[in-house]
Amino acid sequence: MRNYFTFIGLLFLFVFSSFSQENWELLKSVETGKILAWDVDPMSKVIYAKNDALIKLDTSFNVQFTQSVKGFGAVTKIDARHSLKTLIFSEDQQSVAFIDNTLTFHKGIKDLSLLNVSYATNVSYSAQSNRYWVFDDDNSKLLLVDENRRAPQVIENLQGTLGSLSLFQLLEMENVLLIFDRTLGIYLFDIYGSMIDFIETSEAKSIHFADGRLYYMTDDELVRINIKNRNVVRIPLPEKDLVSFRVLGRYIFFQTPTHIKKYFLKKVR
């Protein structure tokens, strides 16, 4: 009987592994070593921060541009959704800056303390390249900063609305603002600050949003949820020990402890 269950277990692992590989095609891979932050722009070009430099890869994963950030500080967030104007954030220095498509700094460095931010832990671009979100952890508030206006829009007392909050990832995509707490789940807000949904999960490691679908990654699966009808698709991951991911159409970019990889996701239900 023990041999029977061992056989069934091995058969399951074989089928799971085969199904995983059938869904994915590895297209590109680059060794990065340990990196601080990364993102992918709409042209499928990867930008990542390592040590005191920003590095941009072309679509063949060859180095296209590099830029020193010694004067800016350690980059802890890169948001490259606007291909001509990428946002970078340094938690240590409490500052944001913008770089163009050659990694050249654009209009200097923004000191977040000038916006009455006590301590920011995360930022996110908005749909418009002149606006971005800042999460002030000390005061549990969100600020929507508009470069064309003097004062930011402020959403106060998130702790009172959501309870105990440990924000891990902040992301605005397609007019949906996502607040990801690894211990509780994913909160979805509209751009005016009203909560519209909550996805409970304690297994998610990283999230993304594309084409009306919320994606989150666990140790073993990429989970895709249609926000309108709550249809859920679970896709076995192509490999183990993945750290984070980005979605660009049918292309999924993964960060491992030492590499960034680009996969093509074959059609799933």
Feature-to-residue mapping (PLM):
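Blade-level signature of beta-propeller repeat domains, shared across WD40, Kelch, NHL, RCC1
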Residues: 243-269
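Mid-chain, structured segments of secreted extracytoplasmic proteins
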Residues: 63-104
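WD40 beta-propeller blade core
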Residues: 55-56, 95-97, 141-143, 186-188, ...
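Repeated scaffold domains used in trafficking and secretory/extracellular systems
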Residues: 33-40, 72-80, 117-124, 163-172, ...
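Conserved beta-strand positions in repeat-built beta-propeller and related beta-rich domains
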Residues: 47-51, 87-92, 134-138, 176-183, ...
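Bacterial Sec-dependent N-terminal signal peptides
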Residues: 1-26
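Beta-strand-rich domains and repeat architectures in extracellular enzymes and scaffolds
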Residues: 28-52
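A short beta-strand motif characteristic of beta-propeller blades
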Residues: 22-31, 62-68, 105-114, 150-162, ...
